[in-house]
């Protein structure tokens, strides 16, 4: 719905960028983990996720009036991703050790992705409005983090299970913020479209 809003209004007003950028890097990192582990669920989901998040980042950059900060953040996280790729492929020859290090790297990025929408927490409390938060993204985050936690539990993979638990917690916190500080009549909650 945020992408649809940007295309309709040709504006990025009241839409956060950082959650989508960190999600894109997160998808690309987990795609590498899935390839190394040969887990087709991780590969498929994160390939689709990375493609969609990259589309969002490009549309956001196109409609953003302040392109320089958006581009700098994107390039910074891309540099981190490239440095991580070089580290994991060139400096760690053992596949088991590489899988453990990459799992830890992905876990840290997943936690940062789930915490990034809370960057505006002080602004939300001060303004008593959740206009800058996306309700559909909150619902999706809750469902995704719950699903991945259960998937990690089923596989006995702590790298998948543990970092997704903060997603559940931060989603519940954002649901509370939406209840406590409604976004107002200019941006009501829209239902998720299938």
Language-model regions, residue ranges each:
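Alpha-helical membrane-protein topology signature
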Residues: 1-194
């Amino acid at each position: 719905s945020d992408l649809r809003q940007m295309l309709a209004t040709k504006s990025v007003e009241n839409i956060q960028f950082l959650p989508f950028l960190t999600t894109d890097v997160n998808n690309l990192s987990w795609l590498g983990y899935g390839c190394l582990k040969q887990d087709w669920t991780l590969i498929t989901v994160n390939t689709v996720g990375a493609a969609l998040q990259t589309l969002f980042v490009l549309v956001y950059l196109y409609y953003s009036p302040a392109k320089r900060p958006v581009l700098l953040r994107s390039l910074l996280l891309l540099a981190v991703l490239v440095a991580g790729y070089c580290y994991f492929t060139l400096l760690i020859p053992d596949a088991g050790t590489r899988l453990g290090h990459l799992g830890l790297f992905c876990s840290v990025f997943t936690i940062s992705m789930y915490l990034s929408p809370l960057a505006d927490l002080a602004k939300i409390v001060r303004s008593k409005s959740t206009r800058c938060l996306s309700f559909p993204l909150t619902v999706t985050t809750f469902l995704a983090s719950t699903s991945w936690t259960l998937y990690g539990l089923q596989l006995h993979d702590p790298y998948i299970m543990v970092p997704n638990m903060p997603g559940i917690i931060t989603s519940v916190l954002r649901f509370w913020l939406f209840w406590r500080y409604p976004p107002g009549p200019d941006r009501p909650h829209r239902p998720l479209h299938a």
